[in-house]
């Protein structure tokens, strides 16, 4: 019985010593992250889609914060994310698709041909925002409100039943282009 207590005491002492060493090492050799990169990474949608040309949101945030990369390359985040990053960095907003000549990119949506879907769930596993629902060997469908059009679900599909299509405007999504509405100013006479 005495040897058990010696073993327990020795293991406890070793745990305390190694814990203290690890605690000291974590503070002594800590790497400080750039707070601007942290804030940019918090603004990005974390979909890890790669449409910006970087393998994920964190590398893109580092490129924007440290290397001066353009702030308009996040397609899933769109204009809202670009404006937040521009405000954070105190820079001028840029067109949200990365191409200066096209100010309003067409929103794309993944569409599944349900007749050809075999229910393999590879598209569900590839979707970074969980916009595809379905079960194994059952029909899958895309929730249009969540789909960012990142194209990551298209390649894994073995039957090639997924394609990206432009989103059609509906009465709910259509917006007035106020610059094309003719406005006529009528002078008003003041009567005393």
UniProtKB/Swiss-Prot annotation:
An annotated GO cellular component: plasma membrane
Subcellular location: Cell inner membrane
Main subcellular location: membrane
Cysteines paired by S-S bonds: none
Biological processes annotated in GO: electron transport chain
Cofactor info, note text: Binds 3 [4Fe-4S] clusters.
Designated name of the protein: Ion-translocating oxidoreductase complex subunit B
Organism annotation: Salmonella typhimurium (strain LT2 / SGSC1412 / ATCC 700720)
């Amino acid at each position: 019985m005495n040897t058990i207590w010696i073993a327990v005491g020795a293991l406890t002492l070793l745990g305390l010593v190694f814990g203290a060493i690890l605690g000291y090492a974590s503070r002594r050799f800590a790497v400080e992250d750039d707070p601007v990169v942290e804030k940019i990474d918090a603004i990005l949608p974390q979909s890890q889609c790669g449409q910006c040309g970087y393998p994920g949101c964190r590398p893109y945030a580092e490129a924007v914060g440290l290397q001066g990369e353009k702030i308009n390359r996040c397609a899933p985040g769109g204009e809202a994310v670009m404006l937040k990053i521009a405000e954070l960095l105190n820079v001028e907003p840029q067109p949200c698709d990365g191409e200066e000549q096209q100010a309003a990119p067409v929103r794309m949506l993944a569409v599944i041909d349900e007749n050809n879907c075999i229910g393999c769930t590879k598209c569900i596993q590839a979707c970074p925002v969980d916009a595809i629902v379905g079960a194994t060997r059952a029909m899958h469908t895309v929730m249009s409100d969540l789909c960012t059009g990142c194209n990551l679900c298209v390649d894994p599909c073995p039957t090639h039943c997924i394609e990206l299509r432009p989103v059609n405007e509906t009465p709910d999504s259509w917006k007035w282009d106020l610059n094309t509405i003719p406005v006529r100013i009528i002078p008003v006479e003041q009567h005393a």
